[in-house]
Amino acid sequence: MEALGSGHYVGGSIRSMAAAALSGLAVRLSRPQGTRGSYGAFCKTLTRTLLTFFDLAWRLRKNFFYFYILASVILNVHLQVYI
């Protein structure tokens, strides 16, 4: 959260809370589950890739959607999930 016109962030703990939430999500999603099926390795790779893109977007202060599209074009990463 940024104070209007100041260029400084309000509440220094927001960044650490977001990092802790992201770390917790990564740990929870990387745990093996009994009913993962044949897509287990793919889901793990997909999760790591999305978390990596989110982390880079967070560090560079960019919108995740635009960063994901740019990274997909540059790295030719196609994340397709069969539903």
Curated annotation (Swiss-Prot):
InterPro entries: SMIM10. Keywords: Membrane, Transmembrane, Transmembrane helix. One of its GO terms (cellular component) is membrane. The keyword Transmembrane applies. The chain crosses the membrane at residues 64-82. It is a single-pass membrane protein. It is found in: Membrane. This is Small integral membrane protein 10. It comes from Homo sapiens. The gene is SMIM10.
